Amino acid sequence: MTLIDNQNQTMHQALINALSTSDQIDIQVGYFYFSGFELMAQHLKDKKVRILVGKQIDPNAVPNIIAMQQKTGKPVDLERFQSWDTYVSRTEQKTKYFEGFAKLFNETQVFDNPESQQAYKIFEEKIIDGSLQIKLTNSDEHGKMYLIYNKPEMNQGGDFPGTMFLGSSNFTYNGLIDQGELNSSTRDKSDFMEAKNKFEYK
């Protein structure tokens, strides 16, 4: 087991290392923001990517998020803007999630530089061709898990299906590189397959 704390090694770099022999990544996180995809875009453009998100931000909080981002010049921790309305159906919560996600895309100035514009182009192309899927989990979830699948020629006859990361990092700039986190990684086959099965039924 290897520990990743964003100090001696960042989660960003650990994911890049594991993706070098991969053709697919499954991500389950509490929060996903474009800042996370932008960091990883060049390493994900030829991969199948599935993202499960367990929490949604309140769409009404978007102006406050934008104001805070403009003030600090850095991506914002979205957890404080979580929607706490638990009396609506999960279907309505999913609608709210994508409404809030779209508002952040449309109203923040995240595409003001060539790197962001290129990352967004990759994001858009992957959504269109189906190699990027984003879904809200069926129930409220806060766990963080990254499953990186080895290519067939790299999985040693199925004995080494991939690398699993578990811990605290959301798929955001803060979670991958900027703030203290604690994640562990393992290549154990039984642990990986158990996590894969859990991901499929979320």
Residue ranges and their predicted role:
Residues 1-202:
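PLD/PLD-like phosphodiesterase catalytic module centered on the HKD motif
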